[in-house]
């Protein structure tokens, strides 16, 4: 029956017939793909509009402020409730943390100082509970004392200073600035260690084993000629809704300017308009 037909012609005919059956399916698939792509674009557009709408509804968007200073000695940050205006500010003193350094040096940082187990107690003038650090006689070298103090969360940090010529001193620094965060140090259990690092809080007492190499002090400044003193160089309670960040003392009076910042609102409004136009256009084209 197939004597007059070539096998290749038969195969071509069958292939053409199969392709003809697939053509409608392929067209339908392309149509669905196009619709899915369009819906995806519309979904992205609506999500962008929702994001823009959320941004536009932020409570502080239209009350935002910006700050500028006539000096690098201080800067400021504000909340949305800050009142626009100018402030005259002069800084006469920065807050600083106390540092105590042993008067006597040790020939190395590994040799034990105490001959008996002892307790080192740190007492701050800020009303916080004293913190006691246990020191064993075997661990009473500069290194051992430093490590024990730094593990104790005692409100101070300890370090060893190489002062040269094979001499080492112990340094204790408060973790917080301000006069009220100055500490006193007492040692019980070993008189040698007490003589080496005891400090009764009176810097002029010759019996102290440590000297106050950096004095604990508060920041002092004037705002609109009103004296302000603070334990920190970051002051959030002097001006309503304004936080001052002190970096240095000033030369005379300087000016802090607070202005209304409309740039964020303008950006948010433009983003909302653009998103609204795009979503409206896409929605109309798919109806």
Protein language model features and the residues they cover:
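Bacterial flagellar/type III secretion structural subunits and associated motility module proteins
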Residues: 1-30, 43, 47, 51-169, ...
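Juxtamembrane membrane-water interface segments immediately C-terminal to a transmembrane helix
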Residues: 33-36
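Amphipathic, heptad-repeat-like alpha-helical segments
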Residues: 38-41
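Single conserved hydrophobic/aromatic residue that forms the stacking wall/gate
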Residues: 278, 282-287
């Amino acid at each position: 029956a197939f004597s007059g037909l070539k096998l290749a012609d038969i195969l071509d005919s069958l292939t053409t017939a199969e392709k003809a059956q697939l053509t409608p399916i392929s067209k339908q698939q392309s149509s669905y793909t196009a619709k899915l792509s369009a819906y995806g674009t519309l979904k992205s557009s609506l999500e962008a509009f929702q994001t823009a709408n959320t941004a536009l509804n932020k409570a502080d968007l239209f009350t935002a402020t910006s700050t500028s200073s006539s000096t690098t000695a201080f800067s400021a940050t504000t909340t949305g409730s800050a009142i626009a205006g100018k402030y005259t500010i002069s800084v006469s003193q920065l807050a600083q943390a106390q540092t105590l350094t042993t008067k006597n040096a040790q020939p190395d940082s590994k040799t034990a100082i105490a001959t008996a187990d002892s307790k080192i107690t740190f007492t701050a003038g800020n009303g916080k509970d004293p913190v006691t650090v246990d020191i064993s006689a075997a661990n009473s070298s500069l290194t051992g004392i430093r490590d024990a103090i730094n593990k104790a969360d005692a409100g101070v940090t300890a370090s060893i200073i190489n002062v040269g010529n094979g001499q080492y001193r112990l340094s204790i620094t408060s973790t917080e600035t301000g006069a009220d965060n100055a500490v006193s140090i007492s040692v019980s259990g070993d008189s040698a260690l007490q003589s080496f690092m005891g400090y009764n809080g009176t810097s002029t007492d010759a019996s102290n084993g440590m000297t106050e190499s950096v004095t604990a002090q508060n920041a002092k400044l004037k705002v609109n000629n009103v004296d302000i003193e603070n334990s920190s160089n970051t002051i959030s309670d002097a001006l309503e809704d304004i936080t001052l960040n002190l970096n240095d003392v000033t030369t005379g009076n300087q000016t802090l300017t607070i202005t209304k910042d409309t740039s964020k609102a303008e950006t948010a409004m433009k983003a909302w308009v653009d998103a609204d136009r795009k979503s409206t256009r896409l929605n109309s084209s798919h109806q």
